[in-house]
Amino acid sequence: TATTAKIITLAGNPNPPSLVALYGGSLGDRKTTLSDLENDLYAAGLSVIDFNSRRFLSENDLSQPLIQQIVTELKSNQDTTGATADLVNRINESAPATISTHLTSENRIELIHQFDSSLKKLAAISLQKKPLVIIVQGLERTPTGSFISISEFIANYLNIHKFMFVVSIGEEILQNELTSSNSQMSPDGFLEDVFSAIVTFDEIAVD
């Protein structure tokens, strides 16, 4: 479809946008587009992760399973060496700090720095030329607030060269999340603030 083609074009950029919203349309539209997108990306020889939030409904936070899936994919792209294993250990050790509320700020800053530098190194080793596309879907079924929190988490902690996240969300759900979080932002305002590109079902807006 035209919508799929827009996202494929973004993935083909030398410097793909790190966070793309697939916004609007019906749930069926979004599911079909993501399924086509996944097939087309595989056909183009890209690495793709399909992160389906519905599998993690029992988790109180989606960021940690998302990190684990990314690390597993990066590891599998690479013959595991001592250096790779060490980076994976360092990521696993420091990832919980990204959402921790009980660490001292000094400890947290140190661990977040470790997380950031280790994940960047692992990505650089594993993703030589082609980007890794991570599709995040199923947020329609997760607790209210999940879309905003995972989007902000990706923007803050996973903005890494060669990672391209595609997060799918409907208009009504985003409006509900913003209303329930007492945010004064409009859905468009939120998307423009947090995402690097927004793909809708009739046109494309890229800042």
Where are these regions (language model features)?
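Walker A/P-loop-proximal flanking segment of P-loop NTPase domains
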Residues: 1-55, 64, 75, 122, ...
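Alpha-helix boundary/N-cap detector
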Residues: 2, 65, 79-82, 86, ...
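An amphipathic alpha-helix signature
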Residues: 4, 63-68, 175, 206-207
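Charge-rich, solvent-exposed alpha-helical interaction surfaces
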Residues: 6, 73, 87-90, 114, ...
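The catalytic "switch" region of P-loop NTPases
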Residues: 15, 25-26, 33, 40, ...
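P-loop NTPase motor core
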Residues: 42-100, 202-203
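Short, charged/polar, low-complexity loop and linker segments
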Residues: 48, 138-139
